[in-house]
Amino acid sequence: MSIQTLIIISIVIFILWLTFTSGSSYDPYHNFMKQKNHIFHNINKWVKKDVSKFLETLLKPFDKQCVGKTRTIESLEKLRTENNVEFKKLLNCGYIHNLFILIGLSVWEDFSKLHTETSLNTFINECLIPISTSPNFVAGNMLYTQTKPGVLKCLNDKNL
């Protein structure tokens, strides 16, 4: 065999290996965790301190069985009206809460004027926690598509 043939075979094997080992990136749980880690990393850079452990306390524990596919707030709103049983499962296992927290943190990351640890703490205590613990949110009666604008409004009202 020539060197060129060996190189071509090696490239083909490498491409096949990449194809079969990258399947986990499509797993909804891993997508969520990847998104979470990305947001936490960016917030750590903004506040110039590792606040990941603190941010983890905002999330409810959940596992791979909790979510069968990656969802957006919009798709959850549709699910709430079309398949309330599945929606309640996602609500009860913590996925909806955690998705909201990540969306809220990404709003702070993208739109905060200050990007300080104090600003982050104020935002969490005065914007995220009140919404995520409200009776309507906890019961699944909230219009979830209004949560991002609500969080953004709170961020602007508090001048954070």
Swiss-Prot record:
GO cellular component, one term: membrane
Principal cellular location given in the protein's record: membrane
Membrane topology note: Single-pass membrane protein
Entry's transmembrane regions: 1-21
Subcellular location: Membrane
Domain of life: Viruses
Keywords attached to this entry: Membrane, Transmembrane, Transmembrane helix
Family as reported in the entry's similarity comment: Belongs to the IIV-6 203L/325L family.
Protein name stated in the entry: Uncharacterized protein 203L
Native organism taxonomy: Viruses, Varidnaviria, Bamfordvirae, Nucleocytoviricota, Megaviricetes
